[in-house]
Amino acid sequence: MKMSIRTPPRLLELAGRSLLRDQALAMSTLEELPTELFPPLFMEAFSRRRCEALKLMVQAWPFRRLPLRPLIKMPCLEAFQAVLDGLDALLTQGVRPRRWKLQVLDLQDVCENFWMVWSEAMAHGCFLNAKRNKKPVQDCPRMRGRQPLTVFVELWLKNRTLDEYLTYLLLWVKQRKDLLHLCCKKLKILGMPFRNIRSILKMVNLDCIQEVEVNCKWVLPILTQFTPYLGHMRNLQKLVLSHMDVSRYVSPEQKKEIVTQFTTQFLKLRCLQKLYMNSVSFLEGHLDQLLSCLKTSLKVLTITNCVLLESDLKHLSQCPSISQLKTLDLSGIRLTNYSLVPLQILLEKVAATLEYLDLDDCGIIDSQVNAILPALSRCFELNTFSFCGNPICMATLENLLSHTIILKNLCVELYPAPRESYGADGTLCWSRFAQIRAELMNRVRDLRHPKRILFCTDYCPDCGNRSFYDLEADQYCC
C-alpha cells in the first residue's frame, strides 16, 4: 500500500496536539519540538485558551517575530494575557532559554500571511516552502540592541476608552518600560477625550511614529494641546488632518497665535512626504504660514473642502516644497471668482512629476478653463485626472479633451456632464445626455483611443450620489 505524502505532517500534528493536552508540558520538551510545529500548535493553543502551554511556547518561540494581531481577532483576553506572561518570564529570568530568538511582538493590523503559510504547510507537508515564504522581520532602527524586546502596535483611538486588549497591553508596557521598547508607527485619532489621548502619547516614543491621522471635530484650543506632541514626531512621513474648526470664541489674534504655534511644528518634520487636509477651516488666509514651514519636498498634497483666499492659492503656487508632487487634490475648494493663474503656475511647476490631479467641485467655469489648459497638457506623467462637478459647456469640454490628447499615460479621466445635458430646472435630460455622449464618443475617438473616460452627473437629490457613465452610454455606478 502506497503511503500518502500527507501522512508524516498529519502524524506530527496529532503528536503536537497531544502535547497541548499534557498538563505537565515542560520547557525541555518544547526545546526539542520541530520548528515547523510551533505556528500551528500556537494557533491551536491560543484558540483553545491553553494558557500554560502558551506561556511556555512563547518562551521557546523559535522565530524572531511573533505576529499576534491576527490571532487577537479571536476574542480571548485570557490567551493574550498568557502570551504577555510568557514574555514576562523571558524578560525577567537571568538565564535565557537555549532556543530563545524572539525579539519582536508584532501587534500591527496588517495583512499577515505568517499563520496561513505555516497552516498550509502543516496540511500539505510543504515546510520548505513555508520557510522560503517568511517575511523579513521588521525592526525599529532607533532601538536596535537597546532592549531585548520590541513591541509594534498601531493605535486607533476611536472611542472614549481603549478596548480591553490595548488597555491591558499599555498597562503591561508601562510597568516594564526599561525592559522593552513600544514602537507605534501608525496613530489614528477618530474620537477620544484629549486627556486620554495625552496619557497614551506620553507612553509612546513619538520619534517612531510615521503616520498620523486626526479625524475629529477639534476646535483650535484642542489642536493647541496636540501641537507639542506633533513637533516630536520627527520621522513623520504622512499627516492627515480632517474636520478642524475655528471656535467662535477664538479672536482673530488668538487664531493667528494658535496657527503660528501649530505651523511652526512643521519645521521639525523633515521626513514629511504626504500631507492631507480636509475641512480644515483655519487655513483660510493662513496657508502661507504652513507652507513656509515645510522643509521637505512633498509627494502628496491634498487640500479638500476648505475655504481658501486667492492669496492662499498664490502662496501655494510659489511654495518650493511642491515642485515634486505626484498627487495634487484640491477638490471642494471654490475657485469660481478667482484667477486661475496661480493654478496654472502650480501645474507648470509639477508637470514633470504629477500623476494624479483632482479638481472636482471647484466651481470652475468656462471662462476659467483656458488658463490651465497649456500647463495641463504638459503633465505627461498624469495617469488620473478628475474634473467632476465643474459647470462647463460642451464646447469647453471638447476643448479640454483635445488638450489631454497628448497625455499618453492617462488611464482614468472623469469629466462633468456638460451644461447642455440639463433642463432649465437643473434636472438631467437623459435623451439629451445620451446624444451628447454619442457626440463626445465620436469626437474623442477621432483624436485618440482613451483607456477609460467617465462622465458624471450632479449629485442625486434622493441618494446623494453621482452617476458615472462611460462613452458607450452604459451606467457605471450610482
Curated annotation (Swiss-Prot):
<keyword id="KW-0833">Ubl conjugation pathway</keyword>
<feature type="repeat" description="LRR 4; degenerate">
    <location>
        <begin position="233"/>
        <end position="268"/>
    </location>
</feature>
<feature type="repeat" description="LRR 6">
    <location>
        <begin position="295"/>
        <end position="326"/>
    </location>
</feature>
<feature type="repeat" description="LRR 9">
    <location>
        <begin position="379"/>
        <end position="403"/>
    </location>
</feature>
<dbReference type="GO" id="GO:1990756">
    <property type="term" value="F:ubiquitin-like ligase-substrate adaptor activity"/>
</dbReference>
<dbReference type="InterPro" id="IPR026271">
    <property type="entry name" value="PRAME"/>
</dbReference>
<feature type="repeat" description="LRR 7">
    <location>
        <begin position="327"/>
        <end position="347"/>
    </location>
</feature>
<feature type="repeat" description="LRR 3; degenerate">
    <location>
        <begin position="206"/>
        <end position="232"/>
    </location>
</feature>
<protein>
    <recommendedName>
        <fullName>PRAME family member 9</fullName>
    </recommendedName>
</protein>
<comment type="function">
    <text>Substrate-recognition component of a Cul2-RING (CRL2) E3 ubiquitin-protein ligase complex, which mediates ubiquitination of target proteins, leading to their degradation. The CRL2(PRAMEF9) complex mediates ubiquitination and degradation of truncated MSRB1/SEPX1 selenoproteins produced by failed UGA/Sec decoding.</text>
</comment>
<dbReference type="InterPro" id="IPR032675">
    <property type="entry name" value="LRR_dom_sf"/>
</dbReference>
<feature type="repeat" description="LRR 2; degenerate">
    <location>
        <begin position="181"/>
        <end position="205"/>
    </location>
</feature>
<dbReference type="GO" id="GO:0031462">
    <property type="term" value="C:Cul2-RING ubiquitin ligase complex"/>
</dbReference>
<dbReference type="GO" id="GO:0045596">
    <property type="term" value="P:negative regulation of cell differentiation"/>
</dbReference>
<dbReference type="InterPro" id="IPR050694">
    <property type="entry name" value="PRAME_domain"/>
</dbReference>
<feature type="repeat" description="LRR 1; degenerate">
    <location>
        <begin position="99"/>
        <end position="126"/>
    </location>
</feature>
<dbReference type="GO" id="GO:0008284">
    <property type="term" value="P:positive regulation of cell population proliferation"/>
</dbReference>
<keyword id="KW-0677">Repeat</keyword>
<comment type="pathway">
    <text>Protein modification; protein ubiquitination.</text>
</comment>
<keyword id="KW-0433">Leucine-rich repeat</keyword>
<comment type="similarity">
    <text>Belongs to the PRAME family.</text>
</comment>
<feature type="repeat" description="LRR 5">
    <location>
        <begin position="269"/>
        <end position="294"/>
    </location>
</feature>
<dbReference type="GO" id="GO:0043161">
    <property type="term" value="P:proteasome-mediated ubiquitin-dependent protein catabolic process"/>
</dbReference>
<dbReference type="GO" id="GO:0045892">
    <property type="term" value="P:negative regulation of DNA-templated transcription"/>
</dbReference>
<dbReference type="GO" id="GO:0016567">
    <property type="term" value="P:protein ubiquitination"/>
</dbReference>
<feature type="repeat" description="LRR 8">
    <location>
        <begin position="351"/>
        <end position="378"/>
    </location>
</feature>
<dbReference type="GO" id="GO:0043066">
    <property type="term" value="P:negative regulation of apoptotic process"/>
</dbReference>
<comment type="subunit">
    <text>Component of a CRL2 E3 ubiquitin-protein ligase complex, also named ECS (Elongin BC-CUL2/5-SOCS-box protein) complex, composed of CUL2, Elongin BC (ELOB and ELOC), RBX1 and substrate-specific adapter PRAMEF9.</text>
</comment>
